[in-house]
Amino acid sequence: DIPFHSIVLMGAGEPLTNYEEVLHFIHLANDPELLNISYRNITISTCGIVPQIYRLADENIPITLAISLHAPNDRIRNVLVPISKNFRIKDVVSAAEYYFKKTKRRVTFEYILIKDMNASVENAKELCCLIGKMPCHINLIPINGTEHIKLYPPEWKEIKRFQDILLKKGKETTVRKQMGDEIQAACGQLKRRYLNSVT
């Protein structure tokens, strides 16, 4: 058996739309008689289902919440995260702040960097204003391109410039290391291929 000490619910559907089952799983994972995983080592990733973020906060379980933000405003986010049309970005951030106040657990904001879309100096400044003084961690993720979607990561100097603006505003910020992109197996690149059968 390979021991493990953390769990991340991400990339297999929206966890907060399966709320009851996810919560049940979290409690089972924490059970000393089962996996005995600390709540603090469990992360739920969400695209920002506002009512469920408040609901999760009121459970007062000290798990880590990661929110796929990806934009500093509704105009850009509505393109990148279609479900955001149901929840304004300011409401998502307000829910995140409530989560922090209730659980004392700092929220992580995931932010994919896409060239000529959300990675400008103005975007970085707008992101700082959006988040305000809320304690959080910002995870910058240069997009991994695919052969079918013509979206590209910014140049490294643009990524660094974006990060530096956030750091100067006191935002703890890291850039995710890219792994597997050379074989189309990085985050966002895994896909199913259909082969035409020859008859």
Spell out what each predicted region is:
Residues 173-174, 188:
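Short alpha-helical segments used as structural interaction elements across diverse proteins
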Residues 1-169, 173:
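Conserved AdoMet/S-adenosylmethionine-binding subsite of the radical SAM
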Residues 177:
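Conserved histidine-centered catalytic loops in small-molecule metabolism enzymes
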Residues 168, 180-199:
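Radical SAM enzyme core and accessory elements
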